[in-house]
């Protein structure tokens, strides 16, 4: 049954395993698209422009902000990240679900403007495990890790307004929980009510007795 595309907004502290989780979900749902954010962050080893991020200069990013090109944008860990408005509009119109992993600042902007979309927060099993994962990457200095841990405490406080919470202690289990959320939201009556009315030639205005 046809419906508009759903935006699944995913946030998590750095090191919670959000990227691994999202990659598996996109593999499971081939019709789902993973939105690629714009960033001023330097490209890391193994990252590809246009695949992991759209890497742009601060000057280009500022121009896009001034032109209203972003549905949301935020400064995180000293770098800017943003989601192109055109990407969201295109996915909705085509009925394509979109997976968007962004920080809490950007998610809050979208929550105010798109309250009917789905907001999911990913947690590590403990703060100690989060620190272990960050140190195990061997990509950040001690100063950067300390800043990420400090930011994590603030970010976790934001989970109260998210729709769902997944604790990523065991990745296969977290994937199953994520998959269940996607399937359930796709079947939500409010999303497919108008299409059901069209198929059965029924006025689906809320005339129920409940």
UniProtKB/Swiss-Prot annotation:
Ranges for domain Guanylate kinase-like: 5-183
Species this chain originates from: Syntrophotalea carbinolica (strain DSM 2380 / NBRC 103641 / GraBd1) (Pelobacter carbinolicus)
UniProt-listed InterPro entries: GK/Ca_channel_bsu, Guanylate_kin-like_dom, Guanylate_kinase, Guanylate_kinase_CS, P-loop_NTPase
A Pfam family assignment: Guanylate_kin
Gene for this chain: gmk
Role according to the record: Essential for recycling GMP and indirectly, cGMP.
Identification of the protein by name: Guanylate kinase
Record-linked SMART domains: GuKc (SM00072)
Alphabetic keyword roster: ATP-binding, Cytoplasm, Kinase, Nucleotide-binding, Transferase
Keyword Cytoplasm recorded: yes
S-adenosyl-L-methionine among keywords: no
Family of this protein: Belongs to the guanylate kinase family.
A molecular-function term among this protein's GO annotations: ATP binding
Main location: cytoplasm
GO CC entries: cytosol
UniProt-listed Enzyme Commission number(s): 2.7.4.8
Reaction catalysed by this enzyme: GMP + ATP = GDP + ADP
Compartments in which it is found: Cytoplasm
Source taxon at top rank: Bacteria
Binding-site residues for ATP, renumbered to this chain: 12-19
